[in-house]
């Protein structure tokens, strides 16, 4: 049964980190291909989140109306009390409100009451914002993963210092809709109009070893536009994409998963590179492309991911 195997895949992804060899450095990798935004005032949506196959669930307390936020907090507490803390095998993230707000204080109080894996801080614009978020999360639970939202022109301008501010920050999530609104750019059909800014964010995040997640595609009925946007994100170096509806999960996961044909090419490339290394060569030509050690590190990472997914039925997602 394909659905059962995919559920087992998500389960195993969140029981382990992948140790990936990058030269002599071991890099830990946690799958966050799909991050589903869940409006937490809606009890039906929160309960349904227990059954979806997203790598990560983001219980959203920020992108809702101000007068819905108290209801959202109470809804989360009730659902945890009624059904327990487990939401399938998905990572559980609470998206909290802006630094300095009264809502943030209430959000952080909730974070002490329910079991979570991470906090996502909204509207991080400066390195000082990062340090404040670090201080707050350490005061709640230092074992929680710290994630931050990049959603303003100022945050894009400051992205390098934001990423450099603290090793505690593990994940950078782009709030592409708010960013586009502030830039007065229409991204209803996709994110190509802000690709320059997305590339800048991805570059800085990767330079400082962060996982970087693209913003959602809001037209849930336009599957092709969403796939196109997801492919753009993958090609820019993003590790995953946030989304607003479970219908988008499977093909987003698929795009961020290595394919069999790609892995076969990577294996051939590694074999040729290792043979060339024996003769003192550090760069080879493979399929008319120059390959050096950094490309080999990428290939090994993709092979490791593919092998893990395949062992759990990932081959069902196609070749």
At which residue positions do the language-model features occur?
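AMP-binding adenylation
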Residues: 1-26
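Expand to "…catalyze enediolate/carbanion chemistry for C-C bond making/breaking, isomerization
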Residues: 26-319
């Amino acid at each position: 049964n394909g659905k059962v195997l995919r559920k087992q895949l998500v389960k195993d992804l969140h029981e382990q980190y992948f140790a990936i060899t990058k030269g002599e450095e071991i890099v830990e990798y946690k799958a966050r291909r799909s991050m589903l935004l869940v409006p937490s005032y809606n009890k039906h949506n929160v309960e349904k989140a227990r059954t979806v196959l997203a790598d990560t669930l983001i219980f959203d307390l920020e992108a809702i109306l101000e007068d819905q936020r108290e209801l959202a907090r109470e809804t989360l507490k009730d659902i945890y009390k009624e059904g327990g803390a487990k939401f399938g095998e998905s990572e559980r993230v609470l998206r909290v409100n802006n630094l300095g707000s009264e809502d943030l204080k209430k959000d952080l109080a909730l974070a002490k009451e329910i079991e979570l894996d991470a906090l996502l801080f909204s509207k991080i614009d400066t390195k000082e914002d990062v340090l404040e978020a670090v201080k707050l999360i350490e005061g709640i639970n230092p074992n929680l993963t710290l994630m931050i939202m990049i959603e303003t022109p100022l945050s894009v301008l400051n992205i390098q210092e934001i990423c450099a501010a603290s090793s505690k920050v593990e994940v950078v999530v782009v709030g592409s809709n708010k960013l586009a609104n502030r830039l007065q750019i229409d991204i209803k059909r996709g994110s190509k109009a802000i690709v320059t800014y997305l590339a800048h964010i991805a570059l800085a995040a990767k330079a400082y070893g962060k996982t970087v997640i693209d913003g959602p595609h809001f037209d849930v009925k336009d599957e092709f536009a969403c796939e196109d946007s997801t492919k753009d994100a993958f090609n820019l170096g993003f590790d995953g994409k946030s989304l607003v509806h479970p219908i988008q999960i499977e093909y987003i996961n698929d795009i961020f998963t290595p394919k069999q044909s790609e892995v076969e090419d990577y294996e051939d490339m590694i074999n040729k590179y290792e043979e060339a290394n024996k003769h003192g060569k550090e760069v080879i030509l493979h399929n008319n492309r120059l390959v050096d050690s950094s490309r080999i590190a990428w290939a090994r990472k993709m092979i490791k991911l593919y092998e893990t997914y395949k062992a759990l039925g990932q081959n069902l997602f196609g070749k």
